[in-house]
């Protein structure tokens, strides 16, 4: 989706310039970009913990940033169906909890990543440089 243009209209001889659509777009894209970077970081930390035991589950770890709900999901793709057994544990195997540990042990780093995007809200030009529309698929 392209950046909405500025809307100009005249009313009673006064020209108004509205950047509401552009600002709404900018905020939503900054949120998405922050969530994508957070998801990328959490997946990387999860893969480091999983890779010690097996290699296949690490390849099936992925993140999804949903556009309408504007939230982040980190989980295992269908090829890593057994990942929930390692995450939660079974009767015979203790839980590893790689996803949970990746988030809980790195809360400061996650806050720092998202804080980068929040601090850019004041400057529109810097915000536009951070948003990368070509990058749509998570890994």
Language-model features: locations:
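Short, Lys/Arg-rich flexible segments
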Residues: 1-139
């Amino acid at each position: 989706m392209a950046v909405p243009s500025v809307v100009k209209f005249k009313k009673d001889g006064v020209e108004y310039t509205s950047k509401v659509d552009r600002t709404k777009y900018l905020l939503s894209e900054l949120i998405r970009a922050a969530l994508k970077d957070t998801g990328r970081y959490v997946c990387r930390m999860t893969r480091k913990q999983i890779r010690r035991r097996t290699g296949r589950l690490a390849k099936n770890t992925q993140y999804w940033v949903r556009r309408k709900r504007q939230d982040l999901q980190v989980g295992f793709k269908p090829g890593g169906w057994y990942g929930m057994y390692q995450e939660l544990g079974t009767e015979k195997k203790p839980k590893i909890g790689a996803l949970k540990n990746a988030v809980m042990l790195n809360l400061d780093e996650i806050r720092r990543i998202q804080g980068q995007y929040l601090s850019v809200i004041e400057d529109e030009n810097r915000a536009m440089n951070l948003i990368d529309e070509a990058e749509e698929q998570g890994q």
